């Protein structure tokens, strides 16, 4: 089963690749090439991008910064990532629009739901930056919110691991991977895949979540085609 309208959630760390921080142009190029193949198959794709490769609000808050201020700085970091991703996509011929939750009219459109959906219908990729425009909400929650707003069939969370595990597979060799699990299991077992607000929002709107490895070439296309390459939360 190929999904027709997809919300792809990219973490800031995914854009960092092997670098300690910032954006790895080779990773952006690889993601752009994968996305171009998806769009060629007439799949409507929207992207929410995080900012953890540049600044993380929770970390800033823990270091003594006011939490709301730290979150606003994090939102600006996501906009940097969004326009960098737009550049990469347009270099491989993918028509792309950036919409931000905080108005920055010189570099991006403001987020307007109907306009975003019109772009998707015309075959353009829409990259959402600036989080949801409010502090105290993660970009995972933004992904769930935007997916519900644009009537996406699935949220695809592209990460550094190939699915959801019962514990950190980088620390525990015996970690067990789930091929599928329920929203309730994620919430009750406090499995660290997305924050509880994002999971609850997807649960309430019956939007499945696919978690997969972004660094394996071609995985975005495989995930969109419905191949069982990661973990499905439903």
From Swiss-Prot:
Gene Ontology CC: cytoplasm
Gene3D superfamilies in alphabetical order: Acetylglutamate kinase-like
Pathway: Pyrimidine metabolism; CTP biosynthesis via de novo pathway; UDP from UMP (UMPK route): step 1/1
Main location: cytoplasm
Pfam families: AA_kinase
Reaction it catalyzes: UMP + ATP = UDP + ADP
GO biological process: 'de novo' CTP biosynthetic process; UDP biosynthetic process
GO molecular function: ATP binding; UMP kinase activity
Enzymatic class: transferase
Binding site for UMP: 51, 71, 132-139
Subcellular location field: Cytoplasm
Enzyme Commission number(s): 2.7.4.22
Binding site for ATP: 9-12, 52, 56, 159, 165, 168
InterPro entries: AceGlu_kinase-like_sf, Asp/Glu/Uridylate_kinase, Uridylate_kinase, Uridylate_kinase_bac
CDD domains: AAK_UMPK-PyrH-Ec
Keyword terms, alphabetized: ATP-binding, Cytoplasm, Kinase, Nucleotide-binding, Pyrimidine biosynthesis, Transferase
Regulation: Inhibited by UTP.
Function: Catalyzes the reversible phosphorylation of UMP to UDP.
Family of the protein in this entry: Belongs to the UMP kinase family.
HAMAP family in the record: PyrH_B
Subunit details: Homohexamer.
Protein's UniProt name: Uridylate kinase
Organism expressing this protein natively: Prochlorococcus marinus (strain AS9601)
